[in-house]
Amino acid sequence: MYIQLEGQILSYEKDGEGSPVILLHGNGESHEIFDVLSQQLIKNHTVYAIDSRGQGGSATPNSYHYKDMAKDVILFITSLEIEKPSIIGFSDGGVIALLVAMEQSDLLSSIVVCGANLSPKGLNGSALREIKKLYKKNGSPLVQMMLVEPNINESELQKISVPTLICAGDDDMIKPKETEKIFHNIPGAKGHIFKNATHSSYVEHSDALMSVLPVFWGEE
């Protein structure tokens, strides 16, 4: 499916029935990383799996900024009149989920933020080196975005007024202190660290999140 939002065309998949959930993938990926999780979620939820701008089946923009991607999600929710969705965002998608909730918590019922950072300094040294190496090799503006953004300060997180679950792997490329900083600055946030998990292993092609989502959403 496609939707045009103020000149930006986004590709997305919709499936299932029940309270709405929006899935946001990481940098250079597509909604397909959520294939296994979606199959569990659609049993009780209407799932909207979005390809962020310039990724998957979505149109390539003139430039890449997390705030523009967050605006896309806000317009997606309001244009389709999705009532109080929960957002699950991984990596870049987690950053976008934070920005949406900072801007318009009133649109949402909750956010689940997996492996997000507040700034490039929140990445560990080896991850940052790999991203720099990749940018040197391919010059991708999408990769460059990770080297200069996001720039979220702790006080901005306190604008978030929806139930929030912060997740990370115990072997994540996000520094543990960064995850703790996000957790401690969002009022009432809950947190979960996945054992024996990397940045992506508990999210991509995995339903490991189902071990925490029903409890967080009050479905158990």
Across the structure, where does each feature detected by a protein language model lie?
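Conserved HGGG/HGGXW glycine-rich cap/lid loop of the alpha/beta-hydrolase fold
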Residues: 8-59
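Active-site loop/oxyanion-hole signature of alpha/beta-hydrolase fold enzymes
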Residues: 36, 48, 52-86, 211
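Conserved hydrolase catalytic core segment
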Residues: 83-121
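Active-site nucleophile elbow and catalytic-triad environment of alpha/beta-hydrolase enzymes
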Residues: 141-156
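Short beta-strand/loop motif that positions the catalytic acidic residue
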Residues: 160, 166-168
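Conserved alpha/beta-hydrolase "acid-adjacent" motif
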Residues: 173-178
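Catalytic histidine neighborhood in serine/cysteine hydrolases
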Residues: 179-200
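Catalytic active-site module of serine/aspartate enzymes centered on a nucleophile-bearing elbow/loop
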Residues: 196-220
